[in-house]
């Protein structure tokens, strides 16, 4: 098949491109390199089935060839306020790619009679009052808080896809991605796993917000890519699927695991209270994905962390 991956030079997108090439597909990787990196896709450039197009999908453009599937992953995703690549630093670009970019990819999918995959996020649940979160849960969200740039633009992207499915018979599906980690993450991404691993390897303190008892789930990237492909191949038109690892850990537990794996002398440093809008608990209910997609994570947190540490050393 001929497959388009937007955001293909990013963390998840580059892994997805690699997996699709392994499966023998032709891949058109589209990225404006605002937050993605050509280094992430360098290994694919010698593959005759791989084509890279530097393009902002928020702006009008055309894909001349036929297309069977479109994976729309393009969007800044880093919450690191100190990074120039975060959604805080790129508020309007973030909102545009998840609104006009999603609209445009839906139009292209219709014109090409292609399936569309929209990569949404667990952030649409906000600071959830339901635990674990099912796809039917509508969230506890802020429309104007500091995280709303990302959260609300993804919610609107979901609305666009749902409207195209209902009104124009688009073959689209929506996936809500929970915390994912692994090789090719930017070192300044700001999400807790990469921040703790780099701190542990450098012998620096683990910066913990609040008391560290807030919980997260962590999915290794290879599991997530398998889930993404399963959602495209087996997911039903108009459906939403949670993808993530349902095992839950406190931030303090994560710090101790990383300290042990890195052999670090680092200690926890409680730096600030929880940031505004930061959820106390976040964990997916993946019952639907297990039943409908025949998918569930296989890589344990310990195994995944060891892989990431080995990659970074």
Identify the role of each PLM range:
Residues 35-37, 251, 272-288:
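Active-site loop of classical SDR/Rossmann-like NAD(P)-dependent oxidoreductases
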Residues 129, 155, 170-171, 180-195, ...:
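Glycine/proline-rich active-site loop of Rossmann-fold NAD(P)-dependent oxidoreductases
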Residues 149, 189, 221, 251, ...:
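Amphipathic alpha-helical segment in the mid-to-C-terminal domain
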